[in-house]
Regions:
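Outer-membrane beta-barrel biogenesis signature
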Residues: 19-89, 190-194, 217
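Residues on the lipid-exposed face of transmembrane beta-strands in outer-membrane beta-barrel proteins
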Residues: 52-54, 65, 114-118, 128, ...
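Extracellular loop and loop/strand-boundary signature of outer-membrane beta-barrel proteins
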Residues: 49-51, 98-102, 148-156, 210-216, ...
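Outer-membrane pore/translocation modules
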Residues: 131-244, 301
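Residues that define the transmembrane beta-barrel architecture of outer-membrane proteins
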Residues: 59, 108-112, 150, 158-164, ...
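Repeated loop/turn-to-beta-strand initiation elements of outer-membrane beta-barrel proteins
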Residues: 61, 123-126, 175-180, 236-239, ...
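Transmembrane beta-strands of outer-membrane beta-barrel pores
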Residues: 67-73, 132-136, 172, 186-192, ...
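Outer membrane beta-barrel transmembrane domains
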Residues: 76, 82-89, 93-94, 251-358
Length: 358
């Protein structure tokens, strides 16, 4: 278990004390901020793939629903592509057979996220979200010896409520078209971590095994979420930056690795009701900590070390205002990937969502 980075806790706590002590003295700033909030435009929200990118004024609420699709294929070690035959030469760390015999071919992951925000004061916005995961992976099984011929193909699937999180956004600055806020939150992974599936064995028969880590709905862990977000508006343009982290605070046998993320984006109005966006996202994820002794199939995804790495994605999106609410769409693709491998790389991703404020 990793230690929590208390720098974030101190930052947000001090921000909370400062902003609350200034609330009664900051009416001029508040009125100025309300003036800017009243200038509704499609770029009021960041790209739909961002979370916690904006705060609300006192008494305002928002509900949202988002759908995300991500596809993965082609195995990598580091930033280099590797073939099935390359992977079949790797040792099986869990005994027999001596070499890996099952190789992932592609994977689809679908997520549905239900969210809500509410601002009890002008300086604090509360945010919560529940996430449902749907995963499907195609794999190929090879003979364990001799020519290593293909035995056959098979598919594993899983779905469940994955996680629930709750955060508070603390407004630090809101003036002259500049906005700056901090986020501190808690996330609980609630899905099952010991789901089983039918796996094609090297000898040609099917057996029921605990699915590898990447196919589980969650790791049953708890994490601390933190972020800092800054945006600046120049007439029809808007620039933004966000740094965020997710740090494991408690887990059972194992947990997915800690992550750090940097987002930089630009938005521009297309007309009075729509705006396009361009976003760069860099993410670093550590490998899995711990292990489940029942996950021991002769496949790369059964090894906790074959998770995590660094990715740089480029996304392009659009936000459109509706008579009630707004919709967003963003498609993204990796520019570079350096993965703890072997593991499958992301091919492309798509996210769509709807917001309604009241």
């Amino acid at each position: 278990m990793r230690k929590i980075n208390f720098t974030w806790l101190l930052l947000v706590a001090s921000t909370f004390i400062f902003t609350n002590s200034m609330e009664d003295m900051g009416h001029d700033m508040h009125d100025h901020g309300m003036h800017h909030h009243s200038k509704h435009s499609a770029k009021m929200h960041g790209p739909i793939g961002l979370m916690g990118d904006h705060f609300h004024r006192k008494g305002e609420s928002m509900v949202s629903i988002r759908y995300m699709k991500m596809t993965m294929d082609q195995n990598y070690i580091g930033s280099n592509k590797v073939s099935d035959q390359d992977i079949l030469q790797l040792a099986n760390p869990y005994g027999m057979p001596e070499k890996l015999t099952v190789v992932p071919q592609d994977m689809d992951m679908d997520m549905v996220m239900l969210g809500a925000m509410y601002a009890p004061t002008n300086f604090i916005t509360l945010m919560t979200m529940a996430t449902f995961n749907f995963k499907s992976m195609d794999l190929k099984t090879y003979q364990p010896m001799m020519e290593r011929d293909v035995v056959g193909d098979f598919t594993t699937k899983s779905s469940d409520l994955s996680r629930f999180n709750f955060s508070a956004l603390f407004k630090i600055y809101d003036r002259d078209e500049s906005k700056f806020h901090a986020q501190l939150g808690f996330e609980r992974n609630m899905g099952k971590s010991d789901l089983k599936g039918q796996v094609l064995m090297p000898m040609g028969s099917f057996g029921s095994l605990v699915l590898p880590y990447g196919m589980q709905s969650s790791d049953r862990s708890s994490s601390i979420l933190s972020a800092l977000t800054y945006t600046k508006t120049y007439d029809e343009w808007k620039l933004g930056g966000q740094i965020k982290s997710k740090i494991n605070a408690e887990s059972d046998e194992w947990n997915f690795g800690d992550s750090n993320e940097l987002n930089l984006w630009v938005q521009r109005d297309l007309n009075k009701i729509s705006a396009w966006s361009l976003r760069l996202k860099h993410q670093h994820i550590e490998s899995i900590e711990g292990l489940n002794k029942n996950i021991k199939a002769p496949v790369q995804t059964a090894n906790p070390l074959n998770y995590g790495g660094q990715t740089l994605n480029l996304g392009i999106g659009i936000n459109i205002m509706l008579p009630k609410g707004s919709i967003g769409l963003e498609a993204y693709k990796p520019i570079s990937q350096d993965l703890n491998g072997p593991q499958m790389a992301m091919n492309w991703g798509l996210q769509a969502g709807y917001h309604l404020s009241f």
